[in-house]
A protein has these predicted regions:
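Short, ordered beta-strand-loop transition motifs
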Residues: 43, 78, 95-96, 133-136
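Compact, glycine-rich, soluble single-domain proteins
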Residues: 79-123
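N-terminal secretory signal peptides that target proteins for export/translocation
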Residues: 1-24
Length: 176
C-alpha cells in the first residue's frame, strides 16, 4: 500500500532534489566514493627514500649532519626498534633490523605553522625515521610523514624534509 506521504517523499528525493529517479542513491554513492578517495590519500602520506651502498651507522650520521646543516638542533633520537622489542606482545617477530626516529624542530617554521593555524602545532617536532628491514638489512630507508602543501608553512616543511632526506641519502652513499 502506497501512502500519500511516502509518495511525496519518494518524489522529493528522486526527482526534485537530485533531478533523476534514484538520484539520491547516486548522490550518496558518489559522495561515499569521494570520501574513500580522500581517506586513501590522507592515509598514504609517508614518503620513503631507499639508500643503497651504505650501512645503518653511516646513514644515521648522514641524517644528523643533514639536519644540522639546515641550522637545526636534534630534539631526540628514539631507538624505535629497541623500544618495540621491549614492549612487543605475541611472538616478538619484528620487521626491523634496526630502526630509529630522529626528531627536530625549526623555531621559524613552527612559528609560521601555528600562525597559519594553531592546530598545526601537531606538525612539530618534525621527524624522520631511519630503518632497515629484517629481510634486507643492507638497504637503509629514510621515511617521513608529509605535512602536505595546503599552506605556505606546510610547503616549507615539506621542502625542508625533502632536502634533509636527499642530503642524508647522498652523504650515506658518499661516505660508505
Amino acid at each position: 500500500m502506497n501512502r500519500p506521504g511516502n509518495e511525496l517523499l519518494r518524489q522529493m528525493v528522486s526527482s526534485h532534489l537530485f533531478g533523476t529517479p534514484c538520484g539520491a542513491s547516486r548522490f550518496f554513492l558518489v559522495f561515499l566514493s569521494l570520501l574513500c578517495i580522500s581517506t586513501s590519500s590522507i592515509a598514504d602520506d609517508t614518503v620513503v627514500v631507499r639508500v643503497s651502498n651504505s650501512d645503518f651507522r653511516t646513514a644515521h650520521d648522514g641524517l644528523i649532519e643533514a639536519i644540522e646543516s639546515e641550522g637545526l638542533v636534534i630534539g631526540s633520537i628514539l631507538p624505535f626498534r629497541d623500544m618495540l622489542a621491549r614492549t612487543a606482545v605475541g611472538d616478538g617477530a619484528l620487521p626491523y633490523g634496526e630502526a630509529e626516529i630522529v626528531q627536530f624542530c625549526s623555531a621559524l617554521l613552527a612559528a609560521e605553522l601555528v600562525r597559519e593555524a594553531p592546530a598545526q602545532l601537531t606538525l612539530c617536532p618534525l621527524s624522520i625515521a631511519l630503518y632497515t628491514q629484517v629481510e634486507n638489512t643492507s638497504e637503509i630507508r629514510l621515511a617521513y610523514r608529509s605535512p602536505g602543501n595546503s599552506t605556505a608553512g606546510r610547503q616549507r616543511a615539506e621542502s625542508l624534509l625533502q632536502r634533509i632526506v636527499q642530503r642524508a641519502a647522498e652523504l650515506a652513499r658518499l661516505r660508505w
